[in-house]
Amino acid sequence: MKDQKGDVNIVELQGTVGSAPAIDRKKGFEEIIKADPKFKITRSQTGDFTRAKGKEVMEAFLKAEGKKINVLYAHNDDMAIGAIQAIEEAGMKPAKDITIISIDGVKGAFEAMIAGKLNVSVECSPLLGPQLMSAVKDIKAGKTLPKRIVTEEGIFPMEVAAKEFPNRKY
């Protein structure tokens, strides 16, 4: 996308309005793309973190923008998977005609990447719970915790999805 001549038209499927993940994911994305004026969010609407709403909103985006859409940024994988259905039903090829970026790194996203329908999923690991419980046990045992506990997460482009898929815990 960086080497593309002209504007890069982005449509955004936001999470549930007012939720911390939706706010943070929008803010973080906008901070990154503002560094290059050719990246333009042409449409942005809530998909409520659901597959059905993601499909419905993407259908509306496609009716309004059609082939002008270069990138779909979805705040979660479920909305992206719904949007993929809408893109296919519109006769387009997801991950080819429209670059698709989503967040969570769930099993369905890996399946979509392996099928060549999703370009990249940015992991948001649900495995924070076990780390939290371990920290609670350590506190109860009188141990000192590190100042910061980091949950390992990754960025998974479609090219590595098949290799990484067997290692997924969720």
Residue spans of the language-model regions?
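Hydrophobic alpha-helical
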Residues: 29, 42-43, 47-111
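Loop/turn elements at helix/coil->beta-strand transitions in domains of secreted/extracellular proteins
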Residues: 5-9, 36-41, 67-70, 95-99, ...
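Extracytoplasmic substrate-binding proteins
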Residues: 1-27, 32, 36
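Hydrophobic alpha-helical segments within soluble ligand-binding/sensing domains
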Residues: 1-8, 24, 53-55, 105-109, ...
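Hinge/cleft segment of the Venus flytrap/periplasmic-binding protein
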Residues: 13-21, 32-33, 124-170
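Short beta-strand elements at the ligand-binding edges of bilobed clamshell
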Residues: 12-13, 44, 115-126
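Structured segments of extracytoplasmic/periplasmic soluble domains
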Residues: 3, 32-36, 60-64, 86-90, ...
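Short beta-strand elements in bilobed, periplasmic/extracellular small-molecule ligand-binding domains
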Residues: 9-12, 33-51, 152
